[in-house]
Amino acid sequence: KEMRNYIDAGYFSFHKAFGPTGVGALFLKRDFSRNMTPTVLGGGIISHVKKESVEFRSDIKLFEAGTANIAGVIGAGEAVNFLEMIEGGALEHSRSLAKIFIEKLKDLNESYKENKNLEIKIFAADVAKNIGTVSFQTFVNGKEVHPHDVADIFARDNISVRAGHHCAEPLMDYLNIPNGVTRVSFHIYNEEEDINRVLKSLEKVKDIFGK
């Protein structure tokens, strides 16, 4: 109830919460929604249509044009059931792995401190606020390795990461990171062994770009 006093609109996608793609949820404050017009037109969003005018509905159906993604909605419901079953375990597990990964990256930096053959600049929230994602820049012999190159080497080892601006180029400009960062995200299916695999791949980045 308290959140309703502060949020005009909120949305999320289920594909990042164990659900299917193509389905999400949008919360709108009632007064806020009445001042909005639909961006997608289709069946079910109108009250009346005249020859030269249209009258839209005033309820939430205004933003649900056409046939809904029925299978996606059913899948989203099952995702909610799964999240309720595991409760907070997924978040705590991901947070724990992020903490371990950050510490191991710091240890890696320390081991190469003298010759700087490999240096990792870490961008991550405090562990207490971290949800399992760690971003970083990679430097070999003092020169930055482009995040896309890092991701490519990781991919050869069957490690999937995100690389680039992460839909936040203005933030990257503010942080003076023109090439973006490599982002590692941990989830319920990851273990500490996966962290060790990432570290081994970083060693490969050093070997390839240190020649």
Question: Which residues fall in each region the model found?
Answer:
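Pyridoxal 5′-phosphate
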Residues: 1-211
